[in-house]
Amino acid sequence: MDFITINSSNKTEEFALKQVAKQATSSLLYRLGKTIILASVCVEREPVSEDFLPLVVQFLEKSYAAGKIPGGFVKREGRAQDFEILTSRLIDRTLRPLFPKDYRYPTQITLMVLSHDIENDLQVSALNAASAALFLAHIAPIKSVSACRIARMDNEFIINPSASLLNQSSLDLFVSGTKESLNMIEMRSLGQKLNALEEPLMLEALELAQKSLEETCTLYEEIFTPHQNELFFKESQGIVFNERLLDLLKNQYFDEIIKGIESSALSERENVFNEIARKISEAHSEFSLEEIELSLEKVKKTEIRRMIIKDKIRPDKRALEEVRPILIESDLLPMAHSSILFTRGQTQSLVVGVLGTDNDAQTHESLEHKAPIKERFMFHYNFPPFCVGEASSIGAASRRELGHGNLAKRALETSIKNKEQVIRLVSEILESNGSSSMASVCAGSLALYASGVEIYDLVAGVAMGMVSEGQDHAILSDISGLEDAEGDMDFKIAGNLEGITAMQMDTKMSGIKLEILYQALLQAKEARKHILKIMHEAKEKIVINFSHLPTTEIFNVAPDKIVEIIGQGGRVIKEIVEKFEVKIDLNKPSGEVKIMGNKERVLKTKEFILNYLHSLDQELEQYAIDEVLEAQVKRIVDFGAFLSLPKGGEGLLRKQNMDKCQVVLKEGDSIRCRVISFNKGKIALDLA
């Protein structure tokens, strides 16, 4: 068993090697303060035949890690929570580009949170633990990576802030990479205001992150290298292509290949290339279908990259900085509170907005918070198979759908002025040819406005790409699905004219240099300006139907009157809600009553509640202290009996008053009683 301590970037990390889970390919216990994570890597010895990297990353939270028992009926951890899925994706997106292109061995990386102090950053800790475990496993020649988080307070950047400091920050920037370059970025603005970050400041933050990663990765490699396993997989020389087949494709089928490249729809493009492969297979039996498809893919990819880098033209004939045509339509769905159809090229997002009450907020339990938290702004992204012409069933939300919805939410969240408002936006992707998450951001921002939600500014999103060959590279604005698939970078950036509110960067390379990222940021700003101009023009044409939108009426009553509004077993409040078709939130300590729904119904509900309480007060005013009454037993409870009074209303005869007279009552009995007090709107009775 080996213990390793590493001090870097404002934190002290401890690694216990060969202590637990020793049957895994590699395992370690990672410790940062009171946070402990078990990281393990397991590799199967037989490769898969399919052409993909069979990597699975699972980040798992255990309730006992924070001294909790799972909430709900089943007291056991169930399906993964959103935070676990998003963190798993974050780690996967960091590590996947590091593997050799022809690595085909099923690999599972598991991160299990065993203990957690809420002040420590779980995502940074989990990624660093995964990186160390993978580096020690030595399953392939993989570089060491690490992560850091950057916050901003009082115009100063902070590396790896505590949770309490991050809550006060205007920036949340998560960066991972090697000591040479960055390979994954997640960013969002924080705070009560929009807090969009300007591009030069973003570069400054990324430079700070790169220095932190360089320091940590250098230490990791120096300290962990002596503890590595024997190298399992040595990168091969790659696929050896048949030159005769490549010449055949270039000379006889080149025009058809270009036709396929220029096809805008994925299904249409696949049909063209499948037809080419079929023709060659029938005419040249000496080539296998697999060999033909691999060679066809190589020629296609080479030509796409040549077009972009050398000719400065894209497969759909756009210039490198050109954004596809945009069409925006509003108010398509009469019963929703807002609906926006945003079409950019062959990508189409229908975002629907609905406003709700506090009861509609999503409640989450997690290790990052001591108590359950309410998510008041929800953004759900759906990617049905028909949007790319596929025939398959629609199931539960995928990891990708959760990730895209989370990105759109982070882009728009700070643009909302009233953070207490409960809002749900749903993006239905009806057509997709790249950048669907950024189309969701654009449509979502307009949907907020169309719902009558007060926003600081419109927010637009654009996906940037890059193609590189040697020392040459080209940055692409508003990438299509083909450019995403064949390119080297997917850099999604959202913001307004002032700066950036959210971004996400992934790469297929081992990393991206800062100067390329900054060029992409500046080019994205120009694309955003163009998109925002069209969005502002569309905004001017939106007519907000305030009569259809739900309104909220808030008023106060005496706190002791809240129980009267609720009624026995919730009977009164249920009747009010059903009668007026509204939503009601009640606050017992303050006496606040919040009614939400159609404006006319809300006002009628308020009037009804006030009249109802007034009638109860009038009933009390009919009685006097020491007045003797003939009452009837209405119901028996543990602490006494409720009696129906002759002039209306009811009073409580407590059990101790019945016991001292040795009286046994049953429902329906008549009894003489005396009014002894009025307490919080209730009449207290004694036997006369």
UniProtKB/Swiss-Prot annotation:
UniProt cross-references to InterPro entries, sorted A to Z: ExoRNase_PH_dom1, ExoRNase_PH_dom2, ExoRNase_PH_dom2_sf, KH_dom, KH_dom_type_1, KH_dom_type_1_sf, NA-bd_OB-fold, PNPase
PANTHER family xref list: POLYRIBONUCLEOTIDE NUCLEOTIDYLTRANSFERASE, POLYRIBONUCLEOTIDE NUCLEOTIDYLTRANSFERASE 1, MITOCHONDRIAL
Organism ancestry: Bacteria, Pseudomonadati, Campylobacterota, Epsilonproteobacteria, Campylobacterales
Name of the protein described by the UniProt record: Polyribonucleotide nucleotidyltransferase
Major location (coarse): cytoplasm
Family affiliation: Belongs to the polyribonucleotide nucleotidyltransferase family.
Residues passing through the membrane, by range: none
Any single GO BP term: RNA catabolic process
Enzyme class: transferase
Cofactor dependence: Mg(2+)
Function: Involved in mRNA degradation. Catalyzes the phosphorolysis of single-stranded polyribonucleotides processively in the 3'- to 5'-direction.
Keyword annotations of the record: Cytoplasm, Magnesium, Metal-binding, Nucleotidyltransferase, RNA-binding, Transferase
Assigned GO CC terms: cytosol
Catalysed reactions listed for this entry: RNA(n+1) + phosphate = RNA(n) + a ribonucleoside 5'-diphosphate
Residues given in the record as Mg(2+) binding sites: 484, 490
Organism from which the protein derives: Helicobacter pylori (strain ATCC 700392 / 26695)
SUPFAM superfamilies from the UniProt entry: Eukaryotic type KH-domain (KH-domain type I), Nucleic acid-binding proteins, Polynucleotide phosphorylase/guanosine pentaphosphate synthase (PNPase/GPSI), domain 3, Ribonuclease PH domain 2-like, Ribosomal protein S5 domain 2-like
Subcellular location: Cytoplasm
GO MF annotation terms: 3'-5'-RNA exonuclease activity; magnesium ion binding; polyribonucleotide nucleotidyltransferase activity; RNA binding
EC number, as in UniProt: 2.7.7.8
Residues of the S1 motif domain: 626-688
